[in-house]
């Protein structure tokens, strides 16, 4: 093989870009297919998860182009928000709290722009067919304008409010977050059994948050727990702190956890919050916004949460309040960005009011076609489990500003006008006075929006970037990973319902997760990260994409080297198959043959027609792995192992007889089928297919295989049972050679074939040449048997 894969990929990348192969230029008469492409963050490098899930989207984009659609496949970056801030902090060591916030924001912009350029080259190298020449970013003025405009739309619809309310906060990132950004992790901890004094007797409770004793506002037991019925309504004294709290009963208390008695603090977890709300309990906050214990924590004041936990246990033990400790592993809510256990605080925040719309969100989810369908259950479970309105304000810096000021004189909230957007109230004065008291003494909102508040608008942002929103919304397809169903899929469906009373796309295609070869999650700490560029350097982008096509939508995948090897072997096999056809052609011009006559050529066209139907049906149903599996079998077994080997013998014999009609017919048929094989592989393996397509001199060729027509199942099946029977004879000869310990390519002196003699006689010469057999004896038999003599 003399194919330089690296140079081939570079050549076609340049060719596609120079010739605007993927430019979206619709006309009123053409079919259009629109895609809501996931905008990746700019924080870090591409990884195997990217190559897996984005390849799935690209498979469909390329297929739809070949089916005659103008495909709107934009590119964008989600470059604002906490992910970018943390990336810049890590790279520079500079934090926004160091003093110069404006300098930090400029750094975020600079790093984003530099990262975007490098990342785009990586996505191109992977063979993505997006329109990279004009991409959007979520921090651009036009994106900010859309995000702020939709915020004002929420104001008009009474779907947004600012309130002093419990919110989820990450102590590490020092910002509020939403329920969307939490994940459940199983973490090790200690369950501490602590005695409370109850009017001279003892009540033992079990807690994993003893540092919150200063925030204890009640003890709870189950109403039906016979052990504790006589103490409901009495008071207990909190150890070390001395304040008294009521003992109350509620059916939600688990009688079998710990002692069946628990303390409610403000706030240890969601259960604390629920009971606090339900019974209008007092508020005692003992952790500050930075995750430090405050004055309400008494002797723990100034300590971190973990240090406070250790110290309170020591103090409780020294005073004899600890009954016992147990090592446990339990589910803890953590921030998905940094893994820190979250806390619940009372803060003034902006919220999108949507808990009353859960049924509407379920209905919207059901109006979308899910690929695979069972992923919709995850979405519905998430919606049904929502307990909080969406907190969209963040105490950070590099994000979309709220278009809001507050009147210092009357406290009124002043919203910017649509005509003034985009606006940054932190830097720009308002264009109007307070619409309640007329004061000009207005102060800006300094919080920024949650990045998902903007990312949830990507269909609007991407289409509006090209002036196409009114024409093509809702879009046809969104592709994404199942790990962000609760993030991106849900928020986009929710915003689409609230703003437009519709769904954002017709189909939602979900990809699985990527694991190492042993099924373990990849991480730096485990040392099992696979470098995507090392894979493409060694095997090529087509092999990487081949790997990505090995599992069905929604299924997880492992990174196994044999899949990349198979992908590269397929690249080489295609290249060599096409070279063989060129060798057989021997420089003769390719002549169009409308109706082949040779039975072997009719047979391969029949087999091709079958696989075209199977592959097309599979691709129409987003079953790319099924399509590729069927194509692999046809290409490797039917086309290469049987047909190409047969026509070597057929062309050789025809040349000896000067039967140029058979030669021309066979070479044309082989070239046509090779071209169609290339077309069917093209969505998955774009580079090698372009290389081969450009080398096939056949009528009707387009500028690129990726904008040519998809093969059609365009002929009636011919009777091909005779040649199928011959392929069975070939298989038996190969097996007989193997049993005789002779390689397939090694000549043998003689073969005895017991079979349908009338068929075998027609193909005696072909079988002899193809299988390298000196002489063939044929015996008529109902049973097919073959033996060889080396």
Curated annotation (Swiss-Prot):
Annotated family: Belongs to the class-I aminoacyl-tRNA synthetase family. ValS type 2 subfamily.
Species: Thermoplasma volcanium (strain ATCC 51530 / DSM 4299 / JCM 9571 / NBRC 15438 / GSS1)
Protein name: Valine--tRNA ligase
UniProt-annotated location(s): Cytoplasm
Entry domain remark: ValRS has two distinct active sites: one for aminoacylation and one for editing. The misactivated threonine is translocated from the active site to the editing site.
Motif 'KMSKS' region location, chain numbering: 521-525
An example Gene Ontology molecular-function term: aminoacyl-tRNA deacylase activity
NCBIfam families per record: PRK13208.1, valS
Catalyzed reactions per annotation: tRNA(Val) + L-valine + ATP = L-valyl-tRNA(Val) + AMP + diphosphate
């Amino acid at each position: 093989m003399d194919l330089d894969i690296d140079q081939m990929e570079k050549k076609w990348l340049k060719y596609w870009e120079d010739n605007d192969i993927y430019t979206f230029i619709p006309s009123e008469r053409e079919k259009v297919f629109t895609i809501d492409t996931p905008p990746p963050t700019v924080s870090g490098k591409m990884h195997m998860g990217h190559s897996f899930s984005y390849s799935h989207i690209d498979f469909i984009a390329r297929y739809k182009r070949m089916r005659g659609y103008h495909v709107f496949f934009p590119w964008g970056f989600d470059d604002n928000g906490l992910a970018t801030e943390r990336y810049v902090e890590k790279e520079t060591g500079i934090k926004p709290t160091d003093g110069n916030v404006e300098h930090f924001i400029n750094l975020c912009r600079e790093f984003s722009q530099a990262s975007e350029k490098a990342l785009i080259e990586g996505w191109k190298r992977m063979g993505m067919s997006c329109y990279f020449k004009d991409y959007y970013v979520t921090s651009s003025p036009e994106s900010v304008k859309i995000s702020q405009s939709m915020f004002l739309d929420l104001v008009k619809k009474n779907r947004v409010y600012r309130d002093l309310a419990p919110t989820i906060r990450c102590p590490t990132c020092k910002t509020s977050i939403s329920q969307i950004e939490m994940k459940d992790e199983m973490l090790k901890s200690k369950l501490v059994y602590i005695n409370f004094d109850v009017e001279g007797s003892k009540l033992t409770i079990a807690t994993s948050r003893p540092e919150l004793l200063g925030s204890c506002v009640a003890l709870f037991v189950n109403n039906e727990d016979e052990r504790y019925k006589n103490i409901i309504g009495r008071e207990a004294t909190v150890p070390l702190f001395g304040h008294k709290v009521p003992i109350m009963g509620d059916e939600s208390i688990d009688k079998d956890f710990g002692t069946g008695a628990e303390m409610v603090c403000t706030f240890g977890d969601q259960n604390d919050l629920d009971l606090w709300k339900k019974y209008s309990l007092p508020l005692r906050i003992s952790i500050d916004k930075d995750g430090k214990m405050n004055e309400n924590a008494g002797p723990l004041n100034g300590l971190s949460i973990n240090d406070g936990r250790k110290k309170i246990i020591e103090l409780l033990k020294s005073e004899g309040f600890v009954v016992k400790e147990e090592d446990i592993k339990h589910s803890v809510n953590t921030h998905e960005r940094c893994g820190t256990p979250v806390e619940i605080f009372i803060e003034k925040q902006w919220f999108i009011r949507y808990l009353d719309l859960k049924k509407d969100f379920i209905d919207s989810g059901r109006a979308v076609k899910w690929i695979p369908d069972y992923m919709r259950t995850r979405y519905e479970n998430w919606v049904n489990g929502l307990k909080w309105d969406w907190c969209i304000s963040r105490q950070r810096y590099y994000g979309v500003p709220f278009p809001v000021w507050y009147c210092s004189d009357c406290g009124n909230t002043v919203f910017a006008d649509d005509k003034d957007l985009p606006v940054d109230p932190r830097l720009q004065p308002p264009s109007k006075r307070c619409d309640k008291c007329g004061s000009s003494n207005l102060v800006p909102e300094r919080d920024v929006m949650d990045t998902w508040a903007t990312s949830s608008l990507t269909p609007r942002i991407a289409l509006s970037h090209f002036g196409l929103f009114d024409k093509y919304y809702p879009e046809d397809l969104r592709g994404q990973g199942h790990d962000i169903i609760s993030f991106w899929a849900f928020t986009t469906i929710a915003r689409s319902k609230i703003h437009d009373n519709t769904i954002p796309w017709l189909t939602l295609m979900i990809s699985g997760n990527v694991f190492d070869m042993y099924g373990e999650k990849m991480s730096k700490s485990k040392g099992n990260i696979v470098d995507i560029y090392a894979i493409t350097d060694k095997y090529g982008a087509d092999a990487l994409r081949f790997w990505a096509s090995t599992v069905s939508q929604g299924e997880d995948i492992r990174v196994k080297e044999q899949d990349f090897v198979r992908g590269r072997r397929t690249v080489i096999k295609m290249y060599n198959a096409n070279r063989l056809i060129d060798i057989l052609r021997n420089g003769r011009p390719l002549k169009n043959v409308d109706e082949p006559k040779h039975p072997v050529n009719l047979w391969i066209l029949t087999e091709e027609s079958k696989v075209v139907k199977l592959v097309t049906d599979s691709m129409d149903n987003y079953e790319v792995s099924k399509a590729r599996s069927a194509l692999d079998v046809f290409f490797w077994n039917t086309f290469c192992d049987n047909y190409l080997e047969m026509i070597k013998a057929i062309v050789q014999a025809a040349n000896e007889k000067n039967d140029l009609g058979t030669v021309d017919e066979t070479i044309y048929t082989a070239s046509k089928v090779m071209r169609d094989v290339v077309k069917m592989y093209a969505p998955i393996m774009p580079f090698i297919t372009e290389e081969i397509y450009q080398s096939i001199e056949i009528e009707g060729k387009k500028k690129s295989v990726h904008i040519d027509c998809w093969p059609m199942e365009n002929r009636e099946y011919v009777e091909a049972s005779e040649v199928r029977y011959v392929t069975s004879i070939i298989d038996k000869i190969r097996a007989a050679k193997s049993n005789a310990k002779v390689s397939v390519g090694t000549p043998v002196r003689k073969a005895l074939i017991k079979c349908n003699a009338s068929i075998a006689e027609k193909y005696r010469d072909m079988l002899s040449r193809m299988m390298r057999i000196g002489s063939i004896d044929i015996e008529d038999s109902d049973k097919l048997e073959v033996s060889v003599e080396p």
